[in-house]
Regions:
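Glycine-rich beta-strand-turn "strand-cap" elements at beta-sheet edges
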Residues: 2-10, 21, 54-60, 88-108
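Short, well-ordered beta-strand segments in beta-rich or mixed alpha/beta enzyme
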Residues: 15-23, 53-80
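N-terminal first-folded block
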Residues: 15-44
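Short, conserved structural micro-motifs that define repeat-unit consensus positions
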Residues: 39, 48-53
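A generic beta-sheet turn/junction motif
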Residues: 36, 47, 58-59
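An amphipathic, aromatic/His-enriched active-site/gating alpha helix that lines ligand/cofactor pockets
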Residues: 44-47, 69-102
């Protein structure tokens, strides 16, 4: 794995999960936005959540980007079993979007 000398070894071991979400019906953009903001607020309180950011594209209103960093793979798995993820994200967000996950390795 390539990394810079100054990069914290803790960061190398983290789970970085970046997700592109494309809203299928433009009429649902505001709904998806509100649900993602709620998901982010809850996720940031979960054990192991180091970063959970939600971006809304300026060039394509139907596109959102989630940038997540978790201390361990176990923390990410626990997040995916969290009540908010199971009761809000999966049933209310996922049916409204096309989801492209990008588990990532941070280079710098």
């Amino acid at each position: 794995m390539w990394h810079t000398e100054w990069q914290d070894s803790k960061d190398i071991m983290m789970e970085h999960n970046n997700v592109i979400l494309r809203v299928i019906d433009p009429a649902n953009i505001d709904t998806v936005s509100a649900l993602l903001l709620d998901q982010a607020r809850v996720s940031l309180t979960e054990p192991g959540c180091e970063r959970f950011e939600v971006y809304h594209s300026r060039s394509d209103a139907q596109t959102f980007l989630l940038i997540e960093s978790w201390a361990t793979a176990e923390d990410l798995d626990a997040h995916r079993n969290n009540k908010n993820f199971v009761e809000i994200y999966k049933p209310k967000v996922l049916p409204l979007v096309e989801r492209i996950p990008h588990p990532s390795e941070r280079l710098i």
